[in-house]
Each structure stands twice: as C-alpha cells, then as structure tokens.
C-alpha cells in the first residue's frame, strides 16, 4: 500500500514518551462481488498492514498517489470506516474495538478535515451554527456569547471575516469553505487532527497561514 510512505517532522521525542496515536497492522479490505448471488470473488486491499506512531506535538504525513488508501486509512483510524484487521490505540485506549457510543466522547479529541469542504457541511446551516454546534455538543464555552466569540476568533485565524458567520456554505468559494471547515475542526480543541489534503484548494499564502495555525 502506497499509504505506508510517510513524512515525519523533526520533533524530538523522548524514548520514555507514550505515543498519542499508535497504529499496528491496520488493514481495510473491500470485497469484490460478482453474479446474481453477489458472491465474493476477491478483495480490494485499500489499506494493507500499516504501522506508525504519532506523538504529541508531532506531525506525520502519508504520501502516495490518488486512490492509494490515504483517506481510507484516516477514516479507519477515526472509526468512520470499519477496518478488516489491526489495532488503533489513542491516548492509551484501544479505539479500534470501540462502539459508536464509546467513540462519542473521543470525537472532541480526534478530528478530521475532509478534502471536500462542501460535502462535509450542512447546506442548511449558517457558518455560525456549523462552528458552534460541535462546541455545544462538547460543552465548550460557558454561554452562547462565549461560543460566538470563539467562532469569530477562529474565522479570523483562517483569514475569514466575522460577518461571514451569518452566511451559508453555498455563498463561499471552495477555498473559503475549506477554511471554514478548518475553523470548525479547531473549535473543539482536539488533541489530534487528520487533514485529508485540507489545504490543497487554498492559495499558497493562505496555505502557509493555515499550516502555521494547525
């Protein structure tokens, strides 16, 4: 699997430090079915046995051509995609065996910024509602005013304006929507973020700004 090619930063890690995320032998295989009875005749090995650790404050990049399994690996780590085999440990917990209910409290700690910003946003929600909703679910902020103030600050951090809170997703360009999605992911103060080519649609100057923020 090409998703097993990595780029790591040069963060100094103590040998005694425990990884925030540990992935061992992660596999995601999709069955290939044929015939009227839809019998399984083979498997597509989207992810086939990857291993890596990520420590607090560290950045790791999965590098590979389109369709090699990078997105599938990210979704499997967050339990958004069922894995075929392997173990995912997050902050000491074996999340690969967690149910949806058990994963719910961890959604604050583990976030993803999807490659398609429009598909990951509710077109009927204003930007304010989209950013504030996860804060309400995770009980971040003591009041609605606190949450709105935080939403404004996050928008400004990603190069947007406070008045954009009252608008809807269709009123923005692809790059602007992606910046909004990044602000939404940061709203719950996660420990770990998966970025699925999250800055690929942004201008170079904005890319640098957002990467520094992350």
Where are these regions (language model features)?
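A short, proline-enriched helix->beta-strand linker immediately N-terminal to the Walker B motif
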Residues: 187-191, 207
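Conserved signature/switch motifs of ABC ATPase nucleotide-binding domains
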Residues: 170, 188, 200, 212
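Conserved ABC ATPase "signature" region
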Residues: 94, 145-163
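Conserved ABC ATPase signature
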Residues: 168-172, 176
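Hydrophobic anchor residue at the start of the ABC signature
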Residues: 182, 194, 210
């Amino acid at each position: 699997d090409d998703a097993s090619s990595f780029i790591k930063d040069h963060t100094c890690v103590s040998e005694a430090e425990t990884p925030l995320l540990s992935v061992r032998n992660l596999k995601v295989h999709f069955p290939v079915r044929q015939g009227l009875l839809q019998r399984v005749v083979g498997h597509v090995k989207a992810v086939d046995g990857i291993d890596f650790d990520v420590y607090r404050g560290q950045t790791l990049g999965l590098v590979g051509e389109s369709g090699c399994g990078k997105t599938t690996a990210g979704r499997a780590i967050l339990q958004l995609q069922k894995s075929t085999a392997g173990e995912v440990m997050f902050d000491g917990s074996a999340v690969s065996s967690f149910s949806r209910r058990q994963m719910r409290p961890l959604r604050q700690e583990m976030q993803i910024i999807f490659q398609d910003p429009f598909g990951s946003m509710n077109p009927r929600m204003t930007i304010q509602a989209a950013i504030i909703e996860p804060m309400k679910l995770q009980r971040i902020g003591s009041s609605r005013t606190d949450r709105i103030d935080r939403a404004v600050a996050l928008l400004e951090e990603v190069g947007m304006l406070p008045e954009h809170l009252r608008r809807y997703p269709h009123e923005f360009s692809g790059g602007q929507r992606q910046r909004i999605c990044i602000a939404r992911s940061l709203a719950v103060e996660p420990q770990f973020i998966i970025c699925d080519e999250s800055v690929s649609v942004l201008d170079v100057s904005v890319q640098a700004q957002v990467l520094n923020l992350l």
